[in-house]
Design a protein with these regions (language model features):
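C-terminal catalytic lobe of FAD-dependent flavoproteins
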Residues: 305, 314-315, 331-458
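Short beta-strand to alpha-helix junction loop
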Residues: 113-116, 141-150, 190-208, 218, ...
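N-terminal Rossmann-like FAD-binding beta1-loop-alpha1 element of flavoenzymes
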Residues: 53-79
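Dinucleotide-binding Rossmann-like beta1-alpha1 core, especially the glycine-rich loop
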Residues: 97-177, 186, 307-308
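Flavin-dependent oxidoreductases
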Residues: 66, 226-231, 235-321, 325-336, ...
């Protein structure tokens, strides 16, 4: 059956009714969704009464799922442990859905290196895994009251990071590209390699392909404790629905737990991490507003982030956001009247006449900001076999494919990995009936009656 949940995936509210989330990932039958069919201990290798793995990944967001897919290229017994009922239910589901060019990160940082590499990998991944992706280009705009030297600094950073084809353009050319830019905009940094993607479909693609290649996913499974046990780690979990307890054993643990990555790191290491949840609120506008801009419009960045952007989405809507407020609660994904009100005023500095009356939903997400202001990726010095992929805030979505490569290289130094001769590198994405003719839809429903049973939930 069809399933739509704005609570679970706000960005999928972009696709109206029948096209919202055809045969949704969390609601597929076992015949349609092999990932959910793997929830059985009969499939597991046992050792000492525990489920024994070479690698256990904590977190099924875009980073954890990308790592799972990259590892599945090798003969490795791996699993992913996720406390939510589906993949992509944390930071990965509620963000700007941008593939950044890579000009903002400080040269020499992991953010800089991995953003540029991840951006480069997206064309092939989008083709092979059927991920909705478009290189629409991005513009960082400068207004009359701002110092345009800020654009020059971004250009220098981008050149140092290896971002291709960056240039600063003046208002006359800008207005020809984007007629709805604010009258105060004077110039902009243009990055043609910037893009937009559906983060839910991207994460789902990684997870499904990893599953196809043998990685086991355990959903509704909350990690309670992690303890060193000789040459491996013992992971105690609680099933969030049944309340059954289960213990996993793994030679290598990969910590991709988003805003909770510091909690798990601090269970095994004296080198403590501190991750702050940085809340960002968004407004999603109707498809009628989707052509208001064609590029992703950024404002000059600050220490809190890249400002409020205005961007089309791959589904044809318009997205405005985010705010940036540090919060103590790692579950604080509520929206606020003040936050949403501020979006319209702030967006107007770069784009005029944004039709905010056409907002169809609002949502908030949390970014995992680590005190070092960079990604924290690597084996923990005092916890051999425990690998962090922590502090993954923007540009984390863009960097995910490259993070997966980096983490897999670290695993290669810990375990003898051999290529998987049966690796399947392609995957067919979710079929959208709204792209089919009436004749094609009828044929589809005849072959798969599930496509004729539509349920829309607004929980």
């Amino acid at each position: 059956s069809f399933f739509v949940s704005r609570r679970l995936n706000p960005l999928l509210a972009q696709e109206e009714q029948i096209s919202l989330c055809e045969i949704g990932f969390a609601s597929q039958t076992r015949r349609l969704n092999p990932l959910l069919a793997q929830r059985g201990s009969d499939l597991l290798r046992k050792q000492g009464g525990f489920d024994m793995y070479d690698v256990a990944i904590i977190g099924a967001g875009v980073v954890g799922s990308a790592i799972a897919r990259e590892l599945s290229k090798y003969q490795v017994n791996a699993c992913v442990i996720e406390r939510e009922e589906d993949v992509c239910n944390g930071t990965s589901k509620a963000n700007s859905a941008i593939i950044h060019g890579g000009f903002d990160a400080t040269p020499g940082t992991l953010k800089a290196k991995l953003n540029v590499r991840g951006n480069f990998l997206m064309d092939e991944l989008a083709r092979d895994l059927d991920i909705p992706f478009k290189r629409n280009g991005s513009l960082v705009v400068c207004t009359k009251d701002q110092d345009r030297s800020g654009l020059g600094k971004l250009l220098d950073k981008g050149n140092a990071n290896g971002v291709p084809d960056l240039r600063i353009i003046e208002r006359e050319e800008l207005i020809a590209m984007e007629p709805n830019l604010s009258d105060d905009v004077t110039c902009a940094l243009f990055a043609p390699t910037g893009g937009i993607v559906c983060p839910f479909h991207m994460t789902m693609a990684f997870a499904e392909n990893a599953c196809t290649n043998g990685v086991k996913f355990f959903l509704n499974t909350q990690v309670d404790t992690i303890e060193k046990n000789g040459d491996s780690y013992r992971i105690s979990t609680l099933h969030t629905d049944t309340k059954n307890k289960e213990t996993f054993e793994a030679k290598v643990v990969i910590n991709a737990a988003g805003v909770y990555a510091d909690v798990f790191n601090n269970m095994v290491s004296e080198n403590k991490l501190h991750i702050t949840a940085r809340k960002g609120e968004y407004c999603l506008l109707d498809k009628d507003a989707g052509t208001h801009v064609s590029h992703t419009i950024f404002q000059l960045p600050s220490k809190m982030g890249k400002g409020v952007l205005v961007t089309p989405t791959v589904h044809g809507n318009l997205l405005v956001g985010p705010t940036a407020v540090d919060v103590d609660d790692k579950e604080a994904v509520n929206t606020t009247a003040s936050g949403l009100d501020s979006l319209a005023a702030t967006a107007a500095r770069s784009v005029k006449n944004v039709p905010m009356r056409q907002v169809i939903t609002s949502f908030a997400g949390l970014r995992a900001h680590e005190d070092s202001n960079d990604f924290v990726i690597g084996e923990v010095k005092d916890a051999k076999g425990f690998i962090n992929a922590a502090g993954i805030e923007s540009p984390g979505l863009s960097s995910a494919p490259a993070i997966a490569e980096m983490v897999t290289d670290i695993v290669k130094g810990l375990l003898p990995l051999e290529k998987n001769p049966d690796f399947v590198g392609t995957r067919k994405g979710i079929l959208r009936p709204d792209t089919l003719s009436l004749e094609e839809r009828n044929k589809l429903i005849k072959e798969h009656p599930e496509y004729g049973n539509i349920t829309v939930s607004y929980t």
